[in-house]
């Protein structure tokens, strides 16, 4: 009898030793709960860590926005994102839009390396490990077009002249790839570029008759446009093949008008053009005499295509920020300025004569050949610049004061709008008062938005630099805590701090022209 009971007793002991709730069929704490039905808001799937897997299985093309409820950029994107979903649904496109609350779904945010909001990722065919980063615009049509070119063909297949002419006639910018073999790897390069060049429409053909009708004998990418020259050809190198970077630069350069007016609609494309030299003609377009200058400006432009971008700035429009950047008043128009975006150096005509095609051409050649010195912005020296504890420096007196070999000069480079600068202002004033009786120490400040220096450029605010007495034009950048005690310790130690001092405080970046990315600003975590 005891032998018969032994297996039963062993079974009871095993059950008793299991953790509570681990009976057969129970779920361990580490297991995922069963997948839920995925809710929707305004046509957008609302995902969690429990439903992402289901969404990936059910939707072969899935764009997911990682957002934060407090993020202003996310709030601005939300209505456009919903509109894009509605547009694509109306077209019966096989693509789905979804969103994830990043702070609430921290595991997902960490899994996909989300460090700023909004971040959008595109998943294909359920592949969870290698999503594509979204790099397109933030408006509804831009989002929709970015997705169309990924779930559908990025270029239209053209079989005859009627189809080609219909495509060319229907858009301002049309790019057609003429390839004798559509299986060639150059075609894959062409289609890859077509996915992201959303401001152009792309076509593709291998028809010999179309080669003949457009005067081509070998593989060529042709840009058709309804302005300027009307057409620009990019022959494919028979030995090296089609280079994505070279083709991209060609299309960006030749898709720009020879003369572009600066405004809110064109500014992003101007800065994304990858042409470093920009020649700006400042005119008042309400005046007939100024408008007459545009013809000569346009006449000079073709010979500098790809080297210099010709831009018209209307001083009668909302362009005060452009005038300020060049240190100009509206009354200075008509006038020319050239800026190199890489070095930020600015140039002005030396003679200041009339603006003609000849004078514009000569000015451009002189700058490109290094025959014109750049000019630096500077405010006028205030009469009382040295009367307060904090001395006021401008471009015109900076060198004389900062590199005085008999003085130790501590300078704050600031921007009037900078919050960090305003927060540290009381400490800087207190520092100046503390050391105002030290004849060999000067505490100063310089508005770096209105004054430029030949010695170095300022890239963030506030930037603090110490210029010790003595020869050699030595410069020490201060990167520690911005308070009176630490400032004083720094000065008393001759421009050095003990190693235990806390790390540097952040600086607000100097405003830059819009970058090539079309996603715009994001908010970091």
From Swiss-Prot:
The lineage of its organism: Eukaryota, Metazoa, Chordata, Craniata, Vertebrata. Changing residue 284 to Q: Increases formation of a highly stable disulfide-bonded PDIA2 dimer. One of its GO terms (biological process) is protein folding. The active site is at residues 71, 74, 418, 421. It is found in: Endoplasmic reticulum lumen. Acts as an intracellular estrogen-binding protein. May be involved in modulating cellular levels and biological functions of estrogens in the pancreas. May act as a chaperone that inhibits aggregation of misfolded proteins. Residues 27-152, 367-496 form the Thioredoxin domain. The record marks 138 as: Lowers pKa of C-terminal Cys of first active site. GO terms for cellular component: endoplasmic reticulum; endoplasmic reticulum lumen. Residues 492-525 are annotated as: Disordered. Glycans are attached at residues 127, 284, 516. Disulfide bonds join 71-74, 418-421. The record marks 72-73, 419-420 as: Contributes to redox potential value. Residues 505-514 have a biased composition (Pro residues). A motif (Prevents secretion from ER) lies at residues 522-525. It comes from Homo sapiens (Human). Its EC number is 5.3.4.1. Highly expressed in pancreas (at protein level). Pfam families: Thioredoxin, Thioredoxin_6. Residues 516-525 have a biased composition (Polar residues). Belongs to the protein disulfide isomerase family. GO terms for molecular function: disulfide oxidoreductase activity; protein disulfide isomerase activity; protein-disulfide reductase activity; steroid binding. This is Protein disulfide-isomerase A2. Keywords: Chaperone, Disulfide bond, Endoplasmic reticulum, Glycoprotein, Isomerase, Lipid-binding, Redox-active center, Repeat, Signal, Steroid-binding. It catalyses: Catalyzes the rearrangement of -S-S- bonds in proteins.
């Amino acid at each position: 009898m005891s032998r018969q009971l032994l297996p039963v007793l062993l079974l009871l002991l095993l059950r008793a030793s299991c953790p509570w709730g681990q009976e057969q069929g129970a779920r361990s704490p580490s297991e995922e709960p069963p997948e839920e039905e995925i809710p929707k808001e305004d046509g957008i799937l609302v995902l969690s860590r429990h439903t992402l897997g289901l969404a990936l299985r059910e939707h072969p093309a899935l764009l997911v926005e990682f957002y934060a409820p407090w993020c202003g950029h996310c709030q601005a994107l939300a209505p456009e994102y919903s509109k894009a979903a509605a547009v694509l649904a109306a077209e019966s496109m096989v693509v789905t839009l979804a969103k994830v609350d990043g702070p609430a779904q921290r595991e997902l945010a960490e899994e996909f390396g989300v460090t700023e909001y909004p971040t959008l990722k595109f998943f294909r065919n359920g592949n969870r490990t290698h999503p594509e980063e979204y790099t397109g615009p933030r408006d509804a049509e831009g989002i929709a077009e970015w997705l169309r070119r990924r779930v559908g063909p990025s270029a239209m297949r053209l079989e005859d002249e009627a189809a080609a002419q219909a495509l060319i006639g229907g858009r301002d910018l049309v790019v057609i790839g003429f390839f004798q073999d559509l299986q060639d790897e150059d075609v894959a390069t062409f289609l890859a570029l077509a996915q992201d060049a959303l401001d152009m429409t792309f076509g593709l053909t291998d028809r010999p008759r179309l080669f003949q009708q457009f005067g081509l004998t070998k593989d060529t990418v042709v840009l058709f446009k309804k302005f300027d020259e009307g057409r620009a050809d990019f022959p494919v190198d028979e030995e090296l093949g089609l280079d994505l970077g070279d083709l991209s630069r060609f299309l960006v350069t030749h898709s720009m008008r020879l003369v572009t007016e600066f405004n809110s609609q064109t500014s992003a494309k101007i800065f994304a053009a990858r042409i470093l030299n920009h020649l700006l003609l400042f005119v008042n377009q309400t005046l007939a005499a100024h408008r007459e200058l545009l013809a000569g400006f346009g006449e000079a432009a073709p010979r500098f295509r790809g080297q210099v971008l010709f831009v018209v700035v209307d001083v009668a429009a909302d362009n005060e920020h452009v005038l300020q950047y060049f240190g100009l008043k509206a009354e200075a128009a008509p006038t020319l300025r050239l800026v190199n975006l890489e070095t930020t150096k600015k140039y002005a005509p030396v003679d200041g004569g009339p603006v003609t095609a000849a004078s514009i051409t000569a000015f451009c050649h002189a700058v490109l050949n290094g025959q014109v010195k750049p000019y630096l912005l500077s405010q006028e020296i205030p009469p009382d610049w040295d009367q307060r504890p904090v001395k006021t420096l401008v471009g015109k007196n900076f060198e004389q004061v900062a590199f005085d070999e008999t003085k130790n000069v501590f300078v704050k480079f600031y921007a009037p709008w900078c919050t960090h600068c305003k927060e540290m202002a009381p400490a800087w004033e207190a520092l100046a008062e503390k050391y105002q009786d030290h004849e060999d120490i000067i505490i100063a400040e310089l508005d770096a938005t209105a004054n430029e220096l030949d010695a170095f450029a300022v890239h963030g605010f506030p930037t603090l630099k110490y210029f010790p007495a003595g020869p050699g034009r030595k410069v020490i950048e201060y990167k520690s805590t911005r308070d009176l005690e630490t400032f004083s310790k720094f000065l008393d130690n001759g421009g050095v701090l003990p190693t235990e001092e806390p790390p540097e405080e952040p600086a607000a970046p100097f405003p830059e022209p819009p970058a090539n990315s079309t996603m715009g600003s994001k908010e970091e975590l």
